[in-house]
Amino acid sequence: MSIGGDWQKRRVGNLEGLGGIDRRTFVKLSGMSAAALIFGLGPFTEEAVARTRFSDYPFSLGVASGDPLPSGVVLWTRLAPNPLAEDGKGGMPPLKVPVYWEVAEDERFRKVVRRGKGFARPELAHSLHVEVRGLKPAREYFYRFRAGSELSPTGRTKTAPVPGASVGALAFAFASCQMYEHGYYTAYRRMSEEDLDLVVHLGDYIYEYGPNEYVAQSGNVRTHNSPEIFTLSEYRNRHALYKTDEDLQAAHAAFPWIVTWDDHEVENNYADEVSEVDSEPDQDPVVFLGRRAAAYQAYYEHMPLRRASVPTGPDMLLYRRVTYGDLAEFNVLDTRQYRDDQATSDPERQDPSRTITGEEQEQWLFNGLATSRAHWKVLAQQVFFAKREPDEGESYSMDAWDGYLGSRNRVLKFIQDQRIANPIVLTGDVHNNWAAELKANFDHPNSETLGVEFIGTSITSGGDGAATPGPDQQAILEENPHIRFFNGQRGYVRCRLRPELWRTDYRVLPYVKEPGAPIYTKASFAVEAGRPGLQVVSETAVPSRASSLIESDAKRIRAQESADERRRGGRR
């Protein structure tokens, strides 16, 4: 079957006759959203309420909370008695279903402080996003849902302190890149056992590939449940597949999350309205906008996000700011939706007009940094920020900030000119742990250090990994003296901060091919307030399965190119 024919058979909506329209027309054609136009979502008019009897346990995808404020938090669940139903509806009827929720100060719900009723509606895959208000700041709470006679698991959450309030400490973890096929989510189980206030997810929550298209060096251990995803039902099912994992559910239930996306929530290396260069039908921008609308809607449906992030067709507001008293302010960035296309040459990447954030988001970031009263100004974002000069014969990553020098230079110049104190950049994407100092001029190692960047490894993506640098990574460390640390194992990064000190611990697993791995701290770094730069606290030898399984950038790119080749071969 041809690629085009396969797409035509699997898509939900009808794209015929839409060629040549622009984004504005695309969105206006739908009174509700572009997703409704392309993927067959009509406005909900059925007022009947389903009798709440389920074919199986409806809370199969767990519970979650997110985007904490001093007075409240978002509570999330999705009713899905058959979570992997092929139509993407989770085994639910096309009717709204009442869901009751309650929040208590104790785990046994003896002191309930808030309760209410919402409706899980089919147009949002029977997901529920409850924006609870009236809670006390900096408090632990417990929550649960009820639908019919079924009770959800209990979740724990915590509100943020009041902006400007004196806060003595904060503990959080950040994570990214959880390719389902590459390993087990033991890292999330270990994370759920930590004493944390918050989790920050930096993207690649799902991967779009078909079964065994993207193969880890250590081999795949689980299998995606459908070919590459394009339609709303398929994106819904992929999110559901990932969320059926009990370790991931445990981490969601244990802490509030702040989430942002990278590329694989839609498609590898997409840039704004530009699809990855391949032979798929979404090379047509109109088709890609339809795909993006489906992906964005499914993302919203499965994340604890506020109404401000409800997508309008192929557009969704995800960048936002979360404040923890006077201690930390998180500027959560979106480096996918507004970026210029990736550069194809060195002169192009050096073009000062190029942007990875878009002008509006960049100005929003600058305004936030300039007015923040927090001790620590955090940029929670996706791709490598510091310069990473490659080894001889390799090229810069055009997908990272190295491919958008204008954007990076403007951010660093603003930090330097405005004397922004204590900026910290948090990064995912590259499937390895790194730590770097941010220089006023990366070409001059003795130039002023303006801040630091902590780059976190993947939860599973890339397979088992290795504890020590290989030749490629060693060359990068030698070429880039501002990059101070490397580790290639899986895990997450834990950060514990006080007004005077930020401490980062790289938490790693010896393997992910099998469940149940122990967790170790490979290295710890400290940053003193007012003294930007990395201080090594400790670095320890930890167990590792092999030294040859590091997924370098080159290997990762080759593996994803191989995935494209397998996909094309499977569709001939």
Regions found by a protein language model. Name each.
Residues 2-572:
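Metal-dependent phosphoester/phosphodiester hydrolase catalytic core
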